[in-house]
């Protein structure tokens, strides 16, 4: 959530920066509500001050026996009127706060001044490439490899649920489990505390991380409860410290969580209908940081490097990309994407987004720390470390052999228990 004071005092700056996302945001109504709320705060403070003075006068007059009952009742009536007026203003403020919350929650984060300017993904800037992309002819797509090796079944999954669900079978399930354990071990050994959060989250948690209200159509909601299937572990990890003041001495807090993720993919009709790339349910290992506001720029580089380390250990070719202002996620100020090489399509596909959200999520979730004896909002960062299904797809395609088998990356062999997945 953006700072009300910034919107109120520097609206042009806010509008100009939001426009870099490629959309016009009118903040006049928000500024009007914010100014009105500030005026009410001033009125309340003034009335409370007058009421306090009056109480002192009444007390002094009673102690000195300088007041009769009629005068005393008149003063008490005046005090009651002050309290009634304060109560009325408090109710107005409550209504204004709700309106402000609703309006401000629709505004995305301000892009970082360091994010490249651009309208869409075509304007993203490649930072670097790593590894040697496989470019042979007649390479199979991962779904063909998976079907040939009996690693998953999408037909039966459609009977169980509907399209865009998949059941991993045999070595497919085994490979998924191996990847999860491998990623969790790598990150845990790198200073992350492992959490296993709930898969169901409430609306307040989704609001806090920035998924609501904008992405309500992209999520699955329970019919009879204020609960949603979590679209990413970023949601419960943000909410883990909701409404807390964190001791600066223990920062940064670094968490890693494996979780199922659920997305409706409402806007992806006709795209990636086969395989593991775009499913309604998928598994992901998520990295999440709570850090000192002065340290988030360095933390962003570090969390990205931590996600990259998985790709390097698995020897999967990838590139890193600096996301332009028009392609940034709602809560992000700056994002570095990691894209893994998929030989069958001769292109890179996103496998991790590592984002610095500054204090945007912390404001929405009321997560603060103490800096120079003052309470300040903390900074949050998140990144996939990695998406399991897409990692599996990359291993199948980059590790495919002429005999139809798949070579397992050396670092994964102790977890998988074999160097190859072979036809039976």
From Swiss-Prot:
Sorted UniProt keywords: Aminoacyl-tRNA synthetase, ATP-binding, Cytoplasm, Ligase, Nucleotide-binding, Protein biosynthesis
A GO biological process held by the record: selenocysteine biosynthetic process
Catalyzed reactions: tRNA(Ser) + L-serine + ATP = L-seryl-tRNA(Ser) + AMP + diphosphate + H(+); tRNA(Sec) + L-serine + ATP = L-seryl-tRNA(Sec) + AMP + diphosphate + H(+)
Pathway stated in the Swiss-Prot or TrEMBL entry: Aminoacyl-tRNA biosynthesis; selenocysteinyl-tRNA(Sec) biosynthesis; L-seryl-tRNA(Sec) from L-serine and tRNA(Sec): step 1/1
Major site of localization recorded for this protein: cytoplasm
Superkingdom in the source lineage: Bacteria
Disulfide bonds, paired cysteine numbers: none
Family annotation (CDD domains): SerRS_core
Cellular compartment(s): Cytoplasm
Molecular-function annotations in GO: ATP binding; serine-tRNA ligase activity
Gene Ontology, cellular component aspect: cytoplasm
Its job: Catalyzes the attachment of serine to tRNA(Ser). Is also able to aminoacylate tRNA(Sec) with serine, to form the misacylated tRNA L-seryl-tRNA(Sec), which will be further converted into selenocysteinyl-tRNA(Sec).
PANTHER family registered for this protein in UniProt: SERINE--TRNA LIGASE, SERYL-TRNA SYNTHETASE
Domain notes: Consists of two distinct domains, a catalytic core and a N-terminal extension that is involved in tRNA binding.
Subunit structure comment from the entry: Homodimer. The tRNA molecule binds across the dimer.
Protein name: Serine--tRNA ligase
